[in-house]
Amino acid sequence: MKKGFTLIELLVVIAIIAILASVVVVAFPGATKKAKDSRIVSAISQARTVMVYVYGNDGNYDNYSCTVPADEMPPLCAEVANNHPTKGTNPTIATCTTCDVNSGPAACIYSLLNAKASYWYCADSTGKAGFTGTDPSTACAGAASAKCPADITG
């Protein structure tokens, strides 16, 4: 009596493994998008720390951008750009000197996310940071505000 598996038994096991692997591969893109979103959120959170540092040193946000190498923003902007739904798109940064009568300088940074359509992550100089379904371009990028939308959820 010989011991071992027949060719048919091995083929059946390989077929079962292939079916299980295909189920995992179908679920994989969602996980990839969530991982990219986590990288974007992390980079923007670090960029908010840089925002506080720039204001503390300069008293304004004039040097808070993706192009000023001294403030450590270029690598953070590159991280967002590499994980943005439209690869290569930097986060949007907005600053204003006198946003309104009652406040001084302000800044905000935001980026579109991958996992949910029309969903952004935004952080601003007032301490607000979180997810929003409202396009931040009107509030954050508006020269009179530079603040995240009111519906931010953490």
What are these regions (language model features)?
Residues 52, 95, 108-111:
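Structural recognition of the beta-strand scaffold that forms the well-ordered cores
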Residues 39, 101-104:
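A generic fold-level signal
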Residues 103-154:
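Short, surface-exposed interaction loops/tails
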Residues 61-102, 124-125, 141-142, 149-154:
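Polar, enzyme-active/binding microenvironments
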Residues 1-28:
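N-terminal single-pass transmembrane signal-anchor helix
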Residues 30-82:
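Conserved hydrophobic/amphipathic alpha-helical signal-anchor segments
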